[in-house]
Amino acid sequence: MSILENQERLSEDTEAKVIRHARLADRIMTGVFSFAGWFMLQFLILLTGYILITGFMDFDPAFLSASKNGILNQLFNTVYLVILSLIISVPLGIGSGVYLAEYAKPGRLLNFLQISIESLSSLPSIVIGLFGYLVFILMTGMKWNLFAGSLAVSILSLPLITTETNSAIRSLPKEYKEGSLATGATLAQTIKHVLLPAAMPQILTGVIMAAGRGFGEAAALLYTSGQSTVINWSNWNLTSPTCPLNPFRAGETLSLHIWVMRTEGSLNPNATAIATFSSAILVLLTLSFSVITRRMSDRIQKKNQKGS
C-alpha cells in the first residue's frame, strides 16, 4: 500500500471521527436544551397550578365584592393604574426607541443614553418608589394617589419598551427603509407607515413586560399610591376623592393588598385566604393581558404579511 493511500485512509478515518464527535455533541446539547425547556415548562405549570388551586381552595363569593374581605376595589385599582402607566410609558418608550434606532448618531451621546437606560432598568423598585415619594408626593404637596403610582411604574416600564422598540426597528431588513425612501417618502413617513407596523409585534412584547411589571409591582407603589382604598361606586364625579376614575385618590393595588394581608392581616381571620385568592386573581389577570396582547401581535403580523 502506497504512502498516498495511507494518507487518504487516515484522512477519511479522521473525518469520520470528527463527524461522529460532532453528532454526539449535537445530541448531547439537544438533550440538555430540551431538558432545560421541559423543566422550565413543568416548573411554570406547577407554580401556576399551585397558586390557582390554593387561591380558589377557600373561595368565598364575598371575596369578589367591595366589602372588607373583598378585593373588587383593589382589582379595579390594579387595572386602572396599569392602564394609566401604559398611557404614559408606551408613547414615551416607543418614541425613545425610535430616536435611538433612527435619529441618534453613534457617539458619546448614544452610548450615554444606552448606559442610562440599562442603569434605569436595573434600579431596585424601592429606589423608584422613594424617588416618586419625594418628587410626586412631597414636592407637589399631594397625598398618596394613583397618578403618582402610575408615574413611578412608568419609570420602571420605560426601559423595557424603549429597548424592545430599538431592538425591533434595528432588526428589520434594510430593504424596508431603503425601499420606502426610494419611493420619495420622508424618514418620518417611513417610520410611521413602514418601520413601526413591521416592528409592532416585538414592540408589543415590551408592552407585555411593562404591564406585567405594573401588575406585580408593590415596593414602588407603597410610597406613591398608598394602602387605603375608599371608593363609592355610585359617585362618578371625577373631582371627588371617592370617585373610581379619579386618578388623584389613594388606591391600594392587589400586590400591595397581598403584602398587607400577609404581614399586617393578623386581625382578620380570612387574611390568608384573601391573600392566596388575590394571588390567583393577579396571575389570571397577567395571563389574560398577555394572551390578549399576543393575539393582537399575531393579527398585526398576519396583516403585515398579507400586505407585503
Language model: regions and residue ranges:
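Transmembrane alpha-helical segments of polytopic membrane transport and secretion proteins
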Residues: 1-36, 294-308
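Periplasmic/extracellular loop-to-transmembrane helix junction in inner-membrane transport proteins
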Residues: 12-35, 50-87, 106, 260-272
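C-terminal transmembrane helix and the adjacent membrane-cytosol boundary/short C-terminal tail
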Residues: 10, 104, 166, 170, ...
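Hydrophobic alpha-helical transmembrane segments of multipass integral membrane proteins
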Residues: 76, 80-88, 92, 96, ...
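Interhelical loop and adjacent transmembrane-helix boundary motif
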Residues: 63-69, 221-281
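Membrane-cytosol interface at the C-terminal ends of specific transmembrane alpha-helices
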Residues: 96-107, 114, 143-195, 202-210, ...
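Transmembrane-helix boundary motif in ABC transporter permease subunits
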Residues: 85-117, 130, 138, 293-302
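Generic hydrophobic transmembrane alpha-helix motif, especially the helices
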Residues: 118-156
